[in-house]
């Protein structure tokens, strides 16, 4: 993947526009989870250190496009950055006609979704973004799968368009896991529905030595083996697809599970064989035997790609399967890459972030990359690198 990298450029005295992913949860004007901003700090600091005139922007939430709304302002992000960088950070609301920035100064440009035409990748808007800078830095992997004015169009018209350190690291880590992985390569795909992850499962079945399925997805495979799954979440219409995958790939289907008669945090967890599930029961987690079998597989892996929990880990009684799998990944010597919102929540819950080789900041972009789809923002950077 040939793109210009920010780290290869001389930024001194240049106007730099960084498109970051600062779409963080905010409550009462305060940032409640700072993971995405923390991930962007090294990029900001590197540009400031070189004496660049630094502008950074992002979307936040889903405001009505073209209208300012205090609820979706980047002001809480500015407050956070001021505290972390121990220096003043300016928030610019009106910036499309130009912004004055001093060398070594950081200015945050207000939520891009307040600008009409952002989501449609409007050319006039993209040109206005491009005219603000000498160098455009795309560093938001989480939005690289969307062709929008601040992620795609601007890169077409900016004097120079490059990949920031975070985006470069994401692409390298995913490339390492997918293009020529150290083997055995094990992929874990959890989540509620096969339908939303069918392309991912299909792609990974051709790359992985073993494909682990969890959550509602695993229930469809349990049903495909002819077992009663009771009131479990599963997709009857996708049983033929599941059967095909069972033939083409090594998928360790659960042999024991934790079930309940209701979907609730206080429901009693009943451990049983997949042969014995009753009509009024639903599978909410893996059983001990199945979880341990997965842990043994992960112990011998050399590459692990993890997307999605293997049970309803939000309920303490049905957390064990995901915890056993998560700790096995943490203890493994494999190169491990994890992505997706629920996966990151599980990593936080079990406190294993420092034991995962690479944690991806992208949800949809992570899945689309794994599916083998081209990410529009990355394609544009590749095109600009050829010019």
UniProtKB/Swiss-Prot annotation:
It catalyses: (2R)-3-phosphoglycerate + ATP = (2R)-3-phospho-glyceroyl phosphate + ADP. SUPFAM superfamilies: Phosphoglycerate kinase. Keywords: ATP-binding, Cytoplasm, Glycolysis, Kinase, Nucleotide-binding, Transferase. ATP binds at residues 197, 314, 340-343. It is found in: Cytoplasm. Its EC number is 2.7.2.3. GO terms for cellular component: cytosol. It is an enzyme of class 2 (transferase). Pathway: Carbohydrate degradation; glycolysis; pyruvate from D-glyceraldehyde 3-phosphate: step 2/5. GO terms for biological process: gluconeogenesis; glycolytic process. Substrate binds at residues 21-23, 36, 59-62, 113, 146. Coiled coil: none annotated. Its main location: cytoplasm. One of its GO terms (molecular function) is ATP binding. Belongs to the phosphoglycerate kinase family. Monomer. This is Phosphoglycerate kinase. It comes from Photorhabdus laumondii subsp. laumondii (strain DSM 15139 / CIP 105565 / TT01) (Photorhabdus luminescens subsp. laumondii). The gene is pgk.
């Amino acid at each position: 993947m040939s793109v210009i990298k920010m780290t290869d450029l001389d930024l001194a005295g240049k106007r730099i526009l960084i498109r970051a992913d600062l779409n963080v949860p905010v409550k009462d004007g305060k940032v409640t989870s700072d993971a995405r901003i923390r991930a962007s700090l090294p990029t900001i600091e590197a540009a400031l250190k070189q004496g660049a005139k630094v502008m950074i922007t992002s979307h936040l939430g889903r405001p009505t496009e073209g209208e300012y709304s205090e609820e979706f302002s980047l002001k809480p992000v500015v407050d956070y950055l001021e505290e972390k960088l121990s220096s003043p950070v300016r928030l610019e609301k009106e910036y499309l006609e130009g912004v004055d920035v001093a060398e070594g100064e950081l200015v945050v440009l207000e939520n891009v979704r307040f600008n009409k035409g952002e989501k449609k990748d409007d050319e006039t808007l993209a040109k206005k973004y491009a005219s603000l800078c000498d160098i455009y830095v795309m560093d938001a992997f989480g939005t690289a799968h969307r062709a929008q004015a601040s992620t795609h169009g601007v890169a077409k018209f900016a004097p120079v368009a490059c990949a920031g350190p975070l985006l470069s690291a994401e692409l390298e880590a995913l490339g390492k896991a997918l293009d020529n992985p150290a083997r055995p390569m094990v992929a874990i795909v959890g989540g509620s529905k096969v339908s939303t992850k069918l392309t991912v499962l299909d792609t990974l079945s051709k790359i992985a030595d073993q494909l682990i399925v969890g959550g509602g997805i695993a229930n469809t495979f349990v049903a495909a083996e002819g077992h009663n799954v009771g009131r479990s979440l599963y997709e009857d219409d996708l049983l033929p697809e599941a059967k095909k995958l069972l033939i083409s790939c090594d998928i360790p289907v659960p042999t024991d599970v934790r079930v309940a008669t209701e979907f609730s945090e206080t429901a009693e967890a009943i451990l049983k064989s997949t042969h014995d599930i009753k009509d009024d029961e639903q599978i909410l987690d893996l059983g001990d035997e199945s979880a341990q079998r997965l842990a043994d597989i992960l112990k011998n892996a050399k590459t692990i790609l993890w997307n999605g929990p293997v049970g309803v880990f939000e309920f303490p009684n049905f957390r064990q399967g995901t915890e056993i799998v998560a700790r096995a990944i943490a203890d493994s010597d494999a190169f491990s890459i994890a992505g997706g919102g629920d996966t990151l929540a599980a990593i936080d819950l079990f406190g294993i972030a420092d034991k995962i080789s690479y944690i991806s900041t992208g949800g949809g972009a992570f899945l689309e990359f794994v599916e083998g789809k081209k990410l529009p923002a990355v394609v544009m950077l590749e095109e600009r690198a050829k010019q």
